């Protein structure tokens, strides 16, 4: 039996977790050299309170705290949407529970943010953290969603940090942790070209010969040149606006395509796992397994053919009934 100051792990063995007088469990962690995989973790201390108290930090203070602890250069709460900071926090609290080599510290796109949050979810599951991560909300980069989550994570950090030294730059092996772009900024900031240098009137002015000293242009010709230069400048602005809009559409379509491809690969992996399970239990002659295999391997044509006999059976059943009525 464990001593009065120790607890049992979920599997029942003595894991040397220490219980303070107030009942708080301090997880036991084995001091090991970084890079080893023989870590011994206790359960993480779960935090459920999300109410605002005097200890709740302002958005400026909490960003300063994040930058100080894990050596980042974030300027806004919204930049936490990449998930990279949380991954490094988990490595700090529970060394080895997450592989920082897989974390995208220079993430700039939404699917890269989702990748980081999946790593965070895996570390939460490994450490028995009950918190549900609202990934879909966080990756959008909205202020309130990210503020609520970092406020909770600060309390989770305070409940689990044991005061050990930690070098965040060395832990991520010198990876440049570039802050993600501000979600409010425009993605495409094309340099504005000088209208005077690129306008047709500028080229015409250069190619036109010098006016003779004795000649004076008439008023109608000067009015025509003024109107043509004004229309040319307006057309340049319209073209630049169209280019910016088209670039934004192309970028949004690329993001949508990447998201669809990622979702396709995700569900294909699930189907592959189901297929392997069915193959493992296929020799048991289970009707459910056989039915699942038929569904997995059925093509569109086969599914259409399976529906046709049912229709024919219904028509055959209706004919005897009609004959009996007569």
UniProtKB/Swiss-Prot annotation:
Spell out the residue ranges making up region: Disordered.
Answer: 170-239, 297-326
Q: Where is the signal peptide?
A: none
Disulfide linkage: none
Ranges of biased composition (kind: Low complexity) = 199-233, 317-326
List the biased-composition ranges (Acidic residues). 300-312
Which residues get modified to Phosphoserine?
9, 218, 235
Keywords of this protein's UniProt record, alphabetized? Cell cycle, Cell division, Cytoplasm, Cytoskeleton, Microtubule, Mitosis, Phosphoprotein, Ubl conjugation
Q: Which residue ranges does the record assign to the Calponin-homology (CH) domain?
A: 56-158
- State the Gene Ontology terms under molecular function: identical protein binding; microtubule binding; microtubule plus-end binding; protein kinase binding
The annotated region (APC-binding) lies at 258-301
One family from Pfam that matches here is: CH
How does it associate, per the subunit comment? Interacts with DCTN1. Interacts with APC (via C-terminal). Interacts with monomeric and polymerized tubulin. Interacts with SLAIN1. Interacts (via the N-terminal region) with BAG1. Interacts with ASB14. Interacts with HAX1; this interaction is essential for epidermal cell migration.
Q: What is known of its domains?
A: Composed of two functionally independent domains. The N-terminal domain forms a hydrophobic cleft involved in microtubule binding and the C-terminal is involved in the formation of mutually exclusive complexes with APC and DCTN1.
Which family is this protein grouped under? Belongs to the MAPRE family.
Job description of the protein: Adapter protein that is involved in microtubule polymerization, and spindle function by stabilizing microtubules and anchoring them at centrosomes. Therefore, ensures mitotic progression and genome stability. Acts as a central regulator of microtubule reorganization in apico-basal epithelial differentiation. Plays a role during oocyte meiosis by regulating microtubule dynamics. Participates in neurite growth by interacting with plexin B3/PLXNB3 and microtubule reorganization during apico-basal epithelial differentiation.
Task: Name it.
Answer: Microtubule-associated protein RP/EB family member 2
What gene is behind this protein?
A: Mapre2
């Amino acid at each position: 039996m464990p001593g009065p100051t120790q607890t049992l792990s979920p599997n029942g063995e003595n894991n040397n977790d220490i219980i303070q007088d107030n009942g708080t469990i301090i997880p036991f962690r084995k001091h090991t050299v970084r890079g080893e995989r023989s870590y011994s973790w206790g359960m993480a201390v779960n935090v459920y309170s999300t109410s605002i108290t005097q200890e709740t930090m302002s958005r400026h203070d909490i960003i300063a705290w994040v930058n100080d602890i894990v050596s980042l250069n974030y300027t806004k709460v919204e930049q936490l949407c990449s998930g990279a900071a949380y991954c490094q926090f988990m490595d700090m609290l529970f060394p080895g529970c997450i592989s920082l080599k897989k974390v995208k510290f220079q993430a700039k796109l939404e699917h890269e943010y989702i990748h980081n949050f999946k790593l965070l979810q895996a570390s939460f599951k490994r450490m028995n953290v009950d918190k549900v991560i609202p990934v879909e909300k966080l990756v959008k980069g909205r202020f309130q969603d990210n503020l609520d989550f970092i406020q909770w994570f600060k309390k989770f950090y305070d409940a689990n940090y044991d005061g050990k030294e930690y070098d965040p730059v060395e832990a991520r092996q010198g990876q440049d942790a570039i802050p993600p772009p501000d979600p409010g900024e425009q993605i495409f900031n094309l340099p504005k070209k000088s209208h005077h240098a690129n306008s047709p009137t500028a080229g015409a002015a250069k190619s036109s010969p010098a006016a003779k000293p004795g000649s004076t242009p008439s008023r109608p010709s000067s009015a025509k040149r003024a109107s043509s230069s004004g229309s040319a400048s307006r057309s340049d602005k319209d073209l630049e606006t169209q280019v910016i809009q088209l670039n934004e559409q192309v970028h949004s379509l690329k993001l949508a395509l990447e998201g669809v491809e990622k979702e396709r690969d995700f569900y294909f992996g699930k189907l592959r796992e189901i297929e392997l399970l069915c193959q493992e239990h296929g020799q048991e002659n289970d009707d459910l397994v056989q039915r699942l295999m038929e569904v997995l391997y059925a093509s569109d044509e086969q599914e259409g053919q399976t529906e046709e006999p049912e229709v024919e059976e219904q028509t055959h059943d209706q004919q005897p009934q009609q004959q009996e009525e007569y």
